[in-house]
Amino acid sequence: MISNNRIFLVAIAVIGAVALSGLSVVAQQDDERPPMGVFITSVGVGNGANLGGLEGADAHCQRLASAAGAGDRTWRAYLSTQGPGAVNARDRIGDGPWANAVGLVMAANADSLHYDNSNFNWTYMRDENGNQFPSRIDGNPDFSEHDVLTGTQMDGAAFPAGDDRTCNNWTSDSGGSAMLGHADRYSFTTPGSSWNQAHPSRSCSQPDLVATGGAGRFYCFAID
């Protein structure tokens, strides 16, 4: 006859094996999860659209990514510039694919990103820490930070010289204007707004960015 003690020990061993198996699966899933390759900044630079040019914006991306444990990758801001030597945002973000901070692939490549075959929306867009951003569609209709600095047309190209759409190539915190995207893909409560070309900002100042539903945030992409 098998003793009760032996039955108990066998049961404990089985439970332990099942638990270890479960932990192994979780570890394997974590190992298979793609690394973060894109995020919306949790905070802006704090000086309106004066980001210190592309160099300053890239440095901000790198700092935030490093603080979130992703500093081993090279990060670039999704921003265009205008005028002589104009830069297209789509040309400075690598080839993809890009996953968010929780491992969901947001876009496979630049074409899927710019031709509306991506997961760029409020549900999936996260900051570098894996958090969502304030939006009117999250239950607080009076507060939103969905405006994102891009200075970019829907296809990822720079605007032609003329009307300022980059706040003097990201060096102005007063006069001028920047093209903004809607990170939640909503215009108030209406879906379908563009993530990178929704409307120009009132000006380049921090108060005006905040007044229309922003905080000086922008997108950051890993290029490697």
Question: What does each model-identified segment do?
Answer:
Residues 1-12:
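Bacterial N-terminal signal peptides that target proteins for export
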Residues 25-224:
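Secreted/extracellular ectodomain signature
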Residues 10-21:
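Bacterial N-terminal signal peptides
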